[in-house]
UniProtKB/Swiss-Prot annotation:
Belongs to the interleukin-1 receptor family. GO terms for molecular function: interleukin-1 binding; interleukin-1 receptor activity. This is Interleukin-1-binding protein. One of its GO terms (cellular component) is extracellular region. It comes from Vaccinia virus (strain Ankara) (VACV). Pfam families: ig. The keyword Transferase does not apply. GO terms for biological process: symbiont-mediated perturbation of host process. The lineage of its organism: Viruses, Varidnaviria, Bamfordvirae, Nucleocytoviricota, Pokkesviricetes. Glycans are attached at residues 80, 103, 113, 206, 237. Residues 1-18 form the signal peptide. Interacts with mouse Il1b.
Length: 326
């Protein structure tokens, strides 16, 4: 037997051993916190989630994509592998997709959950993106989850449809993908559809998003009534009333008093009970009214100071009264 084949065979096994020994073990970072639900027969782009978490000194040599338990022939790596594309997905494309990043000394992987659904009335709440505006305000409605498709075409044309209110002059598209709604009304609520044209390989594909717009009641600021000043005398019994009026959707507030760094709340006196707070709540004219009474009995010289009534709500409000002693 010639010694030459033996030498080549030894070199081959040694090389394979060294490559296997040097290959870094791949760290599984688990599943990405967000799941993806996309429409059947429309392009889907998934991001490699761990790329943004890698340190600036990490040099990625290769990014690989695969689907757990299936062939990878439906996956199209784009943007140097940092995203993956499926052009005409079907429900069979639902599943777990894995992004693997490697270099000479490091390897990690992270998975994403993709669900492909059909467009139907029964699925509309599953596939729609909820957005909220307030009545009688100026609000915005944004075509959601399209950044990956417009990264290379910031001037992409986006067409809105699906709601009769789009013909109203109060709704204007000043920026692609954003509808400004002036003087929001209750009947602006509903489902709106935005469609983006995505071009890949010389072909045009539609990317559809459905927005479920909710219009919340107009926020009427809470009001507070409190005198600017009161005059009393030493030894007297003084009561100061602070009246807080709330309108829906704001229906509750914590009302308390502050003076010289001390807090005075209902059922929480200053130790000797000389200063106390009593709150009363009642409804009137669709308003919830909280009357907070600060009682000082007896009045001392040290009470010639300021007391602030604070209503902790959204937004919080406060007023201050000055106590003078004659």
């Amino acid at each position: 037997m010639s010694i030459l084949p033996v030498i080549f065979l030894s070199i081959f096994f040694y090389s394979s051993f060294v490559q296997t020994f040097n290959a870094p073990e791949c760290i599984d970072k688990g599943q990405y916190f967000a799941s993806f639900m996309e429409l059947e027969n429309e392009p889907v782009i998934l991001p490699c989630p761990q790329i943004n978490t890698l340190s600036s000194g990490y040099n990625i040599l290769d990014i690989l994509w695969e689907k757990r338990g299936a062939d990878n022939d439906r996956i199209i790596p784009i943007d140097n592998g940092s995203n993956m594309l499926i052009l005409n997905p079907t429900q069979s494309d639902s599943g777990i997709y894995i992004c693997i990043t490697t270099n000479e000394t490091y390897c990690d992987m992270m998975s994403l959950n993709l669900t492909i659904v059909s467009v139907s009335e029964s699925n509309i709440d599953l596939i729609s993106y909820p957005q909220i505006v307030n009545e009688r305000s100026t609000g915005e409605m944004v075509c959601p989850n399209i950044n990956a498709f417009i990264a290379s075409n910031v001037n992409a044309d986006i067409i809105w449809s699906g709601h009769r209110r789009l013909r109203n002059k109060r709704l204007k598209q000043r920026t692609p993908g954003i509808i400004t709604i002036e003087d929001v009304r209750k009947n602006d609520a509903g489902y709106y559809t935005c469609v983006l044209e995505y071009i890949y390989g010389g072909k045009t594909y539609n990317v559809t998003r459905i927005v479920k717009l909710e219009v919340r009641d107009k926020i009427i600021p809470s009001t507070m009534q409190l005198p600017e000043g009161v005059v009393t005398s030493i030894g007297s019994n003084l009561t100061i009333a602070c009246r807080v009026s709330l309108r829906p959707p704001t229906t509750d507030a914590d009302v308390f008093w502050i003076s010289n760094g001390m807090y005075y709340e209902e059922d929480d006196g200053d130790g000797d009970g000389r200063i106390s707070v009593a709150n009363k709540i009642y409804m009137t004219d669709k308003r919830r009214v909280i009357t907070s009474r600060l009682n000082i009995n007896p009045v001392k010289e040290e009470d010639a100071t300021t007391f602030t009534c604070m209503a902790f709500t959204i937004p919080s409000i406060s007023k201050t009264v000055t106590v003078s002693i004659t």
